[in-house]
């Protein structure tokens, strides 16, 4: 008889954004004329850059001709894109990453969720709290997390609280951990680590034999000096870290799907007998078995991001969204609400008004301002009492939403 993978039964009842959509749809049914402004899920609103679109068209035209048609491509990605990434994202910052260490994929969400498959189920996983849910839920599905308590805290995971009290900077684990998920600039808090702070994590991983899974999907939004764009800017990180990047938020690829993961050649992990194995080879084996690669037109489109025109156009989009973030911050100040982030990231992390939990604040904004954000409790126990807004809507909608919120009394 077929049975279910019971690890799936340990998942909380709903992925946070599914619950948000359910509540919004219910509100819309009851209020069909409502002008709802969505500032919750981190989806972009500006179109693809012109340089990207032109490259996309050219690649599609190639696919229409017998001489230039392409079928299955390399699972790791076409060399032209891997080389462009190595040169523009890493060599330009003095970081030594080769094209062979770069794996093209259809999204950082997929890669951060799938990477755990190549590691043993007895590995102890540490996550910052609040945390992007994919890191937690993929390990729940795999069987590493154990059951959850009433607060949604899984017994088998190590949580590293990030709160106002520690300026949202997690402390190094006191107990042994093997896999450490870090995301900076951070989703959901919008905060960052300095090079010195990140170096403490690299040193910890080198001393303890841990491995850092570093999500840098929002690095393009860094505005201030002294904040690393890549963990590999820190000495020794090649020995202890995997990095995830995405074209979704910097180049508008949320619907186009393209990202990449960097697995350095030096990175090795032992089996139960102590024999060392290349993580790059393990990830390559996983990808060649379960993934057929990103389409040729999409990879040509991603390559165009690195042209002078592409760089100028994505900078315009990033500046557009960061102007939205400035409007959000200033409006929250006028409303008397405490907030964090929104300077080096497109996310603003709001402290909910006293006596109001994060879902109550969600319902207040939805019902009284017709604005949708994301309750902090959906990102983990330490997210309770906080609320996330994103800067990814249009300028007009951002201004309108913040005017509505400013009119509320808290």
UniProtKB/Swiss-Prot annotation:
GO biological process, one term: lysine biosynthetic process via diaminopimelate, diaminopimelate-aminotransferase pathway
Transferase among keywords: yes
InterPro entries noted in UniProt: Aminotransferase_I/II_large, DapL/ALD1, PyrdxlP-dep_Trfase, PyrdxlP-dep_Trfase_major, PyrdxlP-dep_Trfase_small
Positions annotated to bind substrate: 15, 42, 109, 132, 187, 292, 388
SUPFAM superfamilies: PLP-dependent transferases
One GO molecular-function entry: pyridoxal phosphate binding
Pathway listed: Amino-acid biosynthesis; L-lysine biosynthesis via DAP pathway; LL-2,6-diaminopimelate from (S)-tetrahydrodipicolinate (aminotransferase route): step 1/1
Cofactor(s) essential for the protein: pyridoxal 5'-phosphate
Enzyme class (EC, first level): transferase
Similarity section: Belongs to the class-I pyridoxal-phosphate-dependent aminotransferase family. LL-diaminopimelate aminotransferase subfamily.
Biological role: Involved in the synthesis of meso-diaminopimelate (m-DAP or DL-DAP), required for both lysine and peptidoglycan biosynthesis. Catalyzes the direct conversion of tetrahydrodipicolinate to LL-diaminopimelate. Is also able to catalyze the reverse reaction in vitro, i.e. the transamination of LL-diaminopimelate with 2-oxoglutarate to produce 2-oxo-6-aminopimelate (in equilibrium with tetrahydrodipicolinate) and glutamate.
Record note on quaternary structure: Homodimer.
HAMAP family in alphabetical order: DapL_aminotrans_1 (MF_01642)
Protein name as annotated: LL-diaminopimelate aminotransferase
Originating organism: Methanothermobacter thermautotrophicus (strain ATCC 29096 / DSM 1053 / JCM 10044 / NBRC 100330 / Delta H)
């Amino acid at each position: 008889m077929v049975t279910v993978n019971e690890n799936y039964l340990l998942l909380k009842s709903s992925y946070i954004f599914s619950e948000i959509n359910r509540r919004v749809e219910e509100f819309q049914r009851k209020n069909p004329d409502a002008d709802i402004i969505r500032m919750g899920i981190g989806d972009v609103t500006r179109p693809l850059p012109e340089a990207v679109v032109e490259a996309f068209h050219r690649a599609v035209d190639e696919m229409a001709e017998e001489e230039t048609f392409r079928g299955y491509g390399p699972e790791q990605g076409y060399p032209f894109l891997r080389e462009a990434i190595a040169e523009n994202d890493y060599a330009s910052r003095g970081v030594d990453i080769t094209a062979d260490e770069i794996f093209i994929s259809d999204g950082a969400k997929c890669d951060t969720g799938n990477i755990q498959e190549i590691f043993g189920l007895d590995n102890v996983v540490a996550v910052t709290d609040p945390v992007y849910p994919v890191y937690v839920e993929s390990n729940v599905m795999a069987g590493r997390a154990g059951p959850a308590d009433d607060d949604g805290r899984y017994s088998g995971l190590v949580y590293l609280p990030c709160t106002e009290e520690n300026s949202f900077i997690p402390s190094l684990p006191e107990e042994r951990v093997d896999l450490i998920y870090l995301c900076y600039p951070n989703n959901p808090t919008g905060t960052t680590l300095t090079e010195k702070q990140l170096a403490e994590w690299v040193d910890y991983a080198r001393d303890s034999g841990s491995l850092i899974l570093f999500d840098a999907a929002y690095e393009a939004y860094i505005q201030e000096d002294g904040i690393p764009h890549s963990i590999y800017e820190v000495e020794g990180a090649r020995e202890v870290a995997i990095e995830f990047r995405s074209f979704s938020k910097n180049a508008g690829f949320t619907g186009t799907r393209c990202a990449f993961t960097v697995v350095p050649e030096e990175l090795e992990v032992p089996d139960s007998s102590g024999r060392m194995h290349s993580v790059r080879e393990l990830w390559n084996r996983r990808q060649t078995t379960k993934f057929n690669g990103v389409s040729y037109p999409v990879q040509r489109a991603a390559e165009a991001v690195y042209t002078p025109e592409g760089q100028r156009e994505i900078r315009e989009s990033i500046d557009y969204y960061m102007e939205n973030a400035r409007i959000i911050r200033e409006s929250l100040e006028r409303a008397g609400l405490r907030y964090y982030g929104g300077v080096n990231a497109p996310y603003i992390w709001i402290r909910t008004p006293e006596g109001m939990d994060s879902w109550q604040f969600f319902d207040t904004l939805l019902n009284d301002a017709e604005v949708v954000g994301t309750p902090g409790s959906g990102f983990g126990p330490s997210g309770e009492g906080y609320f996330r807004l994103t800067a990814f809507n249009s300028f007009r909608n951002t201004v309108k939403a913040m005017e509505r919120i400013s009119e509320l009394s808290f």
